[in-house]
Amino acid sequence: MVTFALPFFMIEVREYVDAKGRSLYRDWLVKLDAATIARVIAAVLRMEGGNFSAAKAVGAGVSELRLDFGPGYRVYFGKDGEQLVILLAGGSKKRQQADIEAAHMLWNEYKRRKREK
């Protein structure tokens, strides 16, 4: 009998907290209803397991996790290496361009603060 073991590792997911202690992702998430929050968290948990099938790059190191329900929710994130995801912001399809611009700004801030440590 031959068995095969696939390498398995979890992706660490963290929220980005700015210098003032704020998380744009958290600020967005807590405004949603409980059922929507549960679906967003389930999607983020799938990313922890390595499932990025609903993600699409939006430039400058930022990607969006597309959630196909409601108004087309999005979670914006950056990958810091292979095993760390930084949640930057959330939004909907309606505000997509403004949310992408905010996520780019936060990602640049994250990288700058990381270099300064």
Write out the residue ranges for each language-model feature.
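Basic, Lys/Arg-enriched alpha-helical interface segments
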Residues: 1-71, 81-85, 92-117
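Short, surface-exposed beta-strand/loop micro-motifs that present aromatic residues
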Residues: 74-78
